[in-house]
Amino acid sequence: MNPNKIIDLKIITVGNYGVGKSSILKRFHQVDLDDNTTGFKTKKFIIDNHHVSVQTWDTSGQERFCSLSSSFYRNCDGVILCFSVDNEDSFKALDLWRDELIKFGYFPDRVPFILVGNKFDLEFKKHVINSKMAQDWCKYQKLKYQVGVNKELPDIIYHETSIEKLVSIDEAFINICRQAFENKIKISLSKLNNNNNNNEENNNNNNNNENNNYNNVPIFQIGQKIRSCCYY
């Protein structure tokens, strides 16, 4: 792949309302938390000497009305699943969000996921979801979707973040962007190899057809063609 070509990545954040998805995105883009801009934002950086343009999409509160459209999910390259460490319901809802993504065709073997537990800065006694519970969920999800998949699924990485203390926000985004980037490269190479194989197969088929056509022509016609050519 041309290192000078800009690679576009679409990263979406999903999770229950109020877990801090918008604030996480604003911190990543270094935007004031009071900024009411919704939709998506773009950030550019370099991964392995490749220029990458990352588009991050926010649900903008639509999840409250179960109204996320297919356009929100369309062509996403990576997913950040979010919950709040002080909200058990948001953790339990992760399965529903994962199923929602799969409903739109974004299977774990096609699109990388990471898990983010936000509000980690809260005093420990307010934590109802600990690190082990989150990591166990990640392991279970991998085993659950490994069935019927012909390749090893990547581990789902878990990050504990804080928008107040700026803990692990950049690390989480760099992680999912790198996974999405590497996955996109693999897909591009796979398509290129498939196209090359198809072209080679088509060429072989064309050659075989030409040989078959030649062999099926009666001898006298071959001779006539040769004489016609020679005596033109």
From Swiss-Prot:
A lipid is attached at residues 229-230 (S-geranylgeranyl cysteine). It comes from Dictyostelium discoideum (Social amoeba). SUPFAM superfamilies: P-loop containing nucleoside triphosphate hydrolases. GO terms for biological process: endocytosis; intracellular protein transport. InterPro entries: P-loop_NTPase (IPR027417), Small_GTP-bd (IPR005225), Small_GTPase (IPR001806). Belongs to the small GTPase superfamily. Rab family. Keywords: Cell membrane, GTP-binding, Lipoprotein, Membrane, Nucleotide-binding, Prenylation. The gene is rabP. CDD domains: Rab. It comes from the Eukaryota. This is Ras-related protein RabP. A motif (Effector region) lies at residues 35-40.
